[in-house]
């Protein structure tokens, strides 16, 4: 899972992820932004579910993050729409609406994001 952190013209951090993990980048860009307390909550949840049968999820404005002891899933909330609710001819590109990754890989990205943000 490759990633890149960039700063836009306003100084905001943007995350770009490798193909198949784009949704992880969208989650950082849309849900986290400058809200590092959300990362605190996610890291605490990861410690809670790691090595257990439990799972945790948090629905945001655009994306929902779900994790169990081994993996993290981030999905666009729009995936809750049924096919009947979509306009004719419209469909969602699932690669950019759902992403799965290992817990350790995800936590490495979180740590790298924190480090990048702290280098303002």
UniProtKB/Swiss-Prot annotation:
Stored HAMAP family: UPF0231
Protein name per its UniProtKB record: UPF0231 protein YacL
Give the record's family classification. Belongs to the UPF0231 family.
The highest taxon in the source lineage is Bacteria
Q: Which InterPro entries match?
A: UPF0231
């Amino acid at each position: 899972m490759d990633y890149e952190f960039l700063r836009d013209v306003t100084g905001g951090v943007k995350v770009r992820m490798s193909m198949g993990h784009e949704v992880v980048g969208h989650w950082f860009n849309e849900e986290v932004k400058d809200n590092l307390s959300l990362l605190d909550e996610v890291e605490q949840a990861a410690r809670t579910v790691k090595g257990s049968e439990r799972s945790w999820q948090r629905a945001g404005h655009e994306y929902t993050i779900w994790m169990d002891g081994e993996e993290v899933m981030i999905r666009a909330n729009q995936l809750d729409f049924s096919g009947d609710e979509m306009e004719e001819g419209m469909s969602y590109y699932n690669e950019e609406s759902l992403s799965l990754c290992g817990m350790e890989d995800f936590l490495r990205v979180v740590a790298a994001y924190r480090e990048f943000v702290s280098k303002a």
